[in-house]
Structure formats: structure tokens, C-alpha cells
Amino acid sequence: MPTETLQTGSMVKPVSPAGTFTSAVPLRILNKGPDYFRRQAEPNPKRLSAVERLEADKAKYVKSQEVINAKQEPVKPAVLAKPPVCPGTKRALGSPTLKVFGNHAKTESGVQRETLKLEILKNIINSSEGSSSGSGHKHSSRNWPPHRDTTDLHRHSFAESLKVYPTPGHGSPQESSSHVSRRLLEQSAETFLHVSHSSSDIRKVTSVKPLKAIPCSSSAPPLPPKPKVAAMKSPEADQVEPACGVSRRPSLQRSKSDLSDRYFRVDADVERFFNYCGLDPEELENLGMENFARANSDIISLNFRSASMISSDCEQSQDSNSDLRNDDSANDRVPYGISAIERNARIIKWLYSIKQARESQKVSHV
């Protein structure tokens, strides 16, 4: 080991902590004093904004004296005005005007605009309130006639449907007494329907028991002997019987001719396409019109049978107590012979035979 290194090592002295602190901190920071450290110890020291810093250094980069003397104010964010109060809440609170909250630092032009808007809103609100009050006064002073256009018609039609017409050939006093009770039931139903026309009220009317019949005269002839079936009935069943008959009667009746006309009202093009299977007139002349008679008759008979079945069902639901009417409706019914599946099968078979005939004609011509 050289002697120089040993000499330098022996010359090194131990450094105290104060010496390390003074050597670590630069001299320029120590010369600033304790105020510099107090400012840094503060939690939120106030810093200059960019505008203020530029304002302080303006003389360095601006040449004209006017710009140097002019002071630039920082741009503040505009405060948005709150939305206007709803008219319903305004009327409930009783405030006649709308309050618009804005910034306190508005210019005169902005204030004038706000006042102009408020005046316009006041005029609109006052005009709308005046028109609504005037219209309400007119409606209150006007005497409207009672609504009789639709309700009276429905009530009249329902009362007509409730009417029970006497059947010919029965003129007994018991029938007249039941007719009187039915008339009383109709009157009570009319007065009840005048108040309300809902379905629940109609059900209540049909379920009400009829009032007792008033005898026509004290000198009425004795009643004829009743048949065995009628003798087995109890008086309670006799009272409930008119109500059941009223509930079973349909309100609308259509004849067979009306139903058949409605079913036969179809377009001519559609009917021709279905009856003649979409063939051209030239092909129909070549094949012969007599081949289409069977298919047309099947289709027409099917339409007529469907219409007659609907009409017979309506007649069957009219009156279950009159045996004569049920017999007539049973005799008027047309028996349902051909089903829809069988008719379709016949049409498909017929079309297939026409196709085979056309192919055979082509082969014969060749």
C-alpha cells in the first residue's frame, strides 16, 4: 500500500450532523430567511393565475401603450338560468309571475331581455286563464239537452227485445195475467236501464222476479184443466219462467234471405276464379262448360247450407218453450250432406282429371 493513501486517510476528520445539514442545503435558500419555509408549510398557498402572470409581464411583449394600460378581466363561466316553473305548480302556489334566477353581474341589455320575456309570459298566462274562465262560464250558463241520441236508442232496442208477443191459438186468462206481469217487468226494466246501461245492470234486470199479476176481472171464467206436464210444475217455477224466456231471447233477428244475401256478396273476379279454377276463357271453351256445373253446384250448396245452419241456430235460441216454433225451424233446416274435406277432395280429383285430359289431347295431336 502506498504511503500517500495512508496519510490522506489519517487526515480525514469525522463530520458532525450540523455540518452535513449545512453542506446539503444550498446557501441561496438559507439566505431567504424563515418566511420562505413558512409559505411552503401553508396548506393552500395562493397562486397567481395565468392571466395575472401575463398581466405582470405585459410590458415585455406588448409595444403599444394603450394595450399596456388596458386591464384584461378573467372570463368567468356563465351561470345558466333555472327552468321556468310549471303552470300547474304556479297556480297551486298562487304566484302570478315566473321567477328566473340569473347571475348578479348581468349587463343592462340582459336585464331588459329578461323583463321582456317575463312580460310576454305574463300576457300569455293571463290570456289563457281568461279564455279558460270564459269558456267555463259559457259551459256553465249553457243548458244542454239530455243525451238521447245513443242511450235512448239502446234502451228502446233492449226494451223491444224484452217484449213477449202472445202466440196465436191461446187466449186463456192465465196468459193474459202473465202478459200483464211481463209488461210490468218491462216497465221496471226501462226505469232501471234509464239510470245505467252496463252489462251488470242488464244481468240484474233479467234476474229480477216479476211482480204479481193483477187479475183482470173478478167474473173471469174458470181455468181449463192443465196438462200433466204443467201440473207437475211448482208455482216458483211459474214465476221464474218469464225471466228465463226474456234472457234467452236474442236482441237481433235476421231472416234467411238476409243471411244468404250477405254470404253471396262477393267480387265477381274472385267468384269466377274459384268456380272456373283460374282457367282462361279459351281453355274453358275447349274443355266444355258442362264440366264445371258439378263444382259450382257443390260450392253454392255449401254456402247456402252454412247460411241456413246459422239462421236455424238463431231460431232455436229464440224460444225454448214454444214447441211449434222448434218444429218449424227443424223442418226448415237443410241437411248438411257434403263436408268441406270431401268437397276439396272432389275438386282436387276433378282438376287432376282435367290435367290428364289435356295431356292426352297433346299426345294425340302429336
Curated annotation (Swiss-Prot):
Biased composition (Basic and acidic residues): 322-331
Phosphoserine modifications at: 234, 297
Matching InterPro entries: FAM110 (IPR025740), FAM110_C (IPR025741), FAM110_N (IPR025739)
Keywords associated with the record: Cytoplasm, Cytoskeleton, Phosphoprotein
Keyword 4Fe-4S in record: no
GO cellular component, one term: mitochondrion
Start and end residues of each stretch annotated as Disordered: 127-152, 163-182, 216-252, 313-333
UniProt subcellular location: Cytoplasm; Cytoplasm, Cytoskeleton, Microtubule organizing center, Centrosome
Keyword Glycoprotein: no
Signal peptide bounds: none
PANTHER family assigned: AGAP005440-PA, PROTEIN FAM110B
Family from the record: Belongs to the FAM110 family.
Protein name (record): Protein FAM110B
Biological source species: Mus musculus (Mouse)
Phylogenetic lineage: Eukaryota, Metazoa, Chordata, Craniata, Vertebrata
